[in-house]
């Protein structure tokens, strides 16, 4: 059908087939950019060095509504790889409005193919069994609240503290 349309615009049949084949190759891989935690975690961003790994679990298999750990300590200017997982049977959010304004998000990898988020990441939803890695640079010192805003999950609270680097 596309080749017929192209021939109506003056392309020969062989030119139309070649053009369609060339365009199809572009779209055979809908995810032309490959990203992996191995590549990003070791990549240097400006002077930040390799990512410092952190892990937070949202919820628990036992049904408890909690963040584990419930207190993260970061240093201003460092690149972090915050791995999150949700082993529970219900969805949970990692919501941190003020933290979103205090970090520079490099990338968020979630699933295959990875999803990339730009700008302020205020909410990250993890469905049951989901995992993701959030790469960011801690920028503004302070203590920031993290919560899961789902009704009934009020007990899920944590803090993230960004401190100035030691001189």
Which residues fall in each region the model found?
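N-terminal export leaders
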Residues: 1-3
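Extracellular/periplasmic metallocenter environments
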Residues: 15-46, 118-167
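N-terminal edge beta-strand
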Residues: 47-79
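Short aromatic-acidic-glycine turn motif
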Residues: 100-111
């Amino acid at each position: 059908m596309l080749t017929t349309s192209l021939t109506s615009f003056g392309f020969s049949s062989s030119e139309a087939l070649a053009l369609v084949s060339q365009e199809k190759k572009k779209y055979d891989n809908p995810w032309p950019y490959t990203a992996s935690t191995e590549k990003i975690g070791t990549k240097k961003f400006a002077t930040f060095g390799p990512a410092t790994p952190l892990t937070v679990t949202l919820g628990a298999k036992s049904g408890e509504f909690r963040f584990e750990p419930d207190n993260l300590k970061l240093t201003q200017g460092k690149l972090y790889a915050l791995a999150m997982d949700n082993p529970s049977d219900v969805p949970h959010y990692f919501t941190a409005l003020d933290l979103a304004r205090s970090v520079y998000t490099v990338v968020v990898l979630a699933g295959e193919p990875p999803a990339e988020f730009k700008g302020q990441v205020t909410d990250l939803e993890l469905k049951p069994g989901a995992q993701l890695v959030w790469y960011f640079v801690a920028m503004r010192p302070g203590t920031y609240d993290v919560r899961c805003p789902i009704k009934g999950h009020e007990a899920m609270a944590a803090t993230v503290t960004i401190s100035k680097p030691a001189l």
